């Protein structure tokens, strides 16, 4: 009997222990997710699905103009649609070639899946593009092309044709004769070269009675461009037309025309959009401008990079289009979505 009592006592203790274990197990359950969350936070910031996304840095020519903000919006939309991660950056000024090269070097060091680049100086980046090629990193150009076969594609406006259209409009508006000046953002990027040459060559070929008296380069800087334009207007009191090859350039021209009281005397034609240009066109101070499709440029460059990574073929040149706009169509359904303030 004594042994029986001992056995019963042991069985009772085991039963109590089992009951206590059963009661305390649910209390421990909430701790598992908390522990899991802490582990995920310390091991890697992105979720498991995000870690598998291709990373594509997008390096632009600048960040200061609304044009680049529109390109950024397009590239971000493409990233969301196509399930890739991007970063978008550019130097503070479109004259900072060295800064852009540093950005490209930093991007290469991260070993990205691909790189989208709008080169400020097409020759200065060749060595880094060759490095990317040796690492198997595809390069997609946007806005500006590069004088190299390394980029698999370039999403861009046909700037030569677009600037030629601006020249045709200028000739029409000044009556086919007179003095005209040109203000360009730079002479090193593909856009600067092509817009200058597209305008100048069209005038030379088709309008022998129009004289281009000056070509300046203002780095897209408003103050510098204003000073350059004022000097040209003061040196040429009979100037009939002024072409600005990007938003920063044309703002300088508009500032100069306004400050010198030349509104209505000089036909002003610009490129891109932005609030100051749009207001000037509506007010009649500016005749019109060429608009690109900046959102489309941003979207198409990321899309081309993703297609390349997926083994799909892409066109070497992706023409994103251009349009002439003035007071008659600035608010039209065709033009309005392409403009930005």
Where are these predicted regions, by residue range?
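Sec-dependent N-terminal signal peptides of Gram-positive bacterial secreted proteins and lipoproteins
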Residues: 6-24
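A residue-level marker of the well-folded mature domains of exported/periplasmic proteins
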Residues: 5, 22-341
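N-terminal secretory signal peptides that target proteins for export/translocation
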Residues: 1-3
């Amino acid at each position: 009997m004594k042994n029986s009592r001992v056995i019963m006592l042991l069985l009772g203790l085991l039963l109590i222990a089992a009951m206590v274990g059963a009661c305390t197990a649910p209390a421990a359950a909430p701790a598992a997710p908390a522990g899991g969350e802490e582990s995920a936070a310390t091991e890697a910031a992105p979720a498991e699905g995000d870690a598998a996304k291709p990373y594509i840095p997008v390096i632009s020519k600048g960040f200061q103009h609304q044009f680049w903000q529109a390109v950024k919006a397009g590239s971000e939309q493409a990233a969301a649609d196509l399930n890739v991660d991007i970063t978008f950056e550019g130097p503070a000024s479109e004259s900072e070639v060295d800064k852009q090269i540093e950005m490209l070097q930093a991007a290469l060091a991260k070993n990205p899946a691909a790189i989208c680049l709008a080169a400020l100086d097409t020759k200065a980046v060749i060595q880094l593009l060759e490095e990317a090629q040796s690492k198997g990193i595809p390069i997609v150009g946007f806005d500006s092309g590069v004088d190299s076969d390394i980029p698999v594609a370039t999403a861009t406006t046909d700037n030569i044709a677009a600037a030629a259209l601006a020249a045709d409009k200028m000739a029409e508006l000044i009556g086919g004769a007179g003095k005209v000046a040109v203000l360009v953002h730079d002479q090193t990027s593909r856009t600067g070269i092509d817009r200058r040459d597209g305008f100048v060559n069209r005038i030379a070929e088709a309008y022998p009675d129009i004289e281009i008296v000056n070509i300046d380069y203002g780095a897209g800087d408003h103050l510098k461009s204003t000073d350059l334009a004022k000097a040209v207007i003061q040196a040429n009191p009979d100037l009939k037309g002024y072409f600005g090859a990007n938003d920063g350039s044309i703002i300088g021209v508009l500032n100069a025309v306004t400050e010198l009281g030349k509104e209505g005397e000089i036909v002003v034609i610009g490129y891109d959009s932005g609030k100051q240009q749009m207001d000037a066109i509506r007010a009649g101070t500016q005749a019109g401008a060429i608009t690109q499709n900046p959102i489309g440029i941003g979207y198409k460059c990321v899309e081309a990079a993703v297609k390349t990574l997926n083994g799909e073929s892409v066109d070497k040149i992706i023409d994103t289009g251009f349009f002439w706009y003035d007071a008659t169509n600035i608010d039209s359904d065709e033009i309005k979505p392409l403009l930005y303030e």
